Amino acid sequence: MRVERCLIDANWGASTEVVYQFCRHSEFAAVLTPSHGRYVGAASLPFSEYRRHPGDRVGHNWRIPAAANGRAVRHLVYDTNYWKSFVHTRLAVPLGETGGLSLFGEKAEAHRQFADHLTAEYRVKTEGRGRTVDEWRVRPGGGDNHWFDGLVGCAVAASMQGVALLEHAPAPAPKPPPRKLSDVQKQKRLEREQRGGYYGL
């Protein structure tokens, strides 16, 4: 399997510049993207209402702002609450159903540590600004959640590469109506006349 997109968390202030430098100078710079998860709660401005600026790339609850601050590397910003809910919803889909995410094998113990990371946070339904969102919080005394963050990043990276659930996929472009042979011949005749010669069909 070829890796087409790899996000690297650049949110931790002490390592932000190191992440940007690595992404800029790596031999894999074409697939590396510094990423910043943003907590978008019920009272926050949702990603769908951000004002788009020239050069921005906007996707499903993520965006890549135009390059700024003298940085040669563009970065990704995504709604962590939305994407954490997205991942947990995928895990809750019954095995074999469309849109599900499952783990390999039959031995639950093989995935215990991974499951601990995925359950180190819990969601709280919160209302504000006329909408209801899940806000994710770390469990009191909860353990590490790094692999949960990593899985969320994988889902966002897949979205960047065009992977989408059917309900989130962009509508296909309409097909042009079929052309009659006589119309094609007429168009070719006109093009030849404009180039300075008419030879008939």
Model-identified regions with their sequence ranges:
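Mg2+-dependent endonuclease catalytic cores in nucleic-acid-processing enzymes, primarily RNase H-like
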Residues: 1-130, 161, 173-201
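Extracellular low-complexity, Gly/Ser/Thr-rich intrinsically disordered linkers
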Residues: 115-166
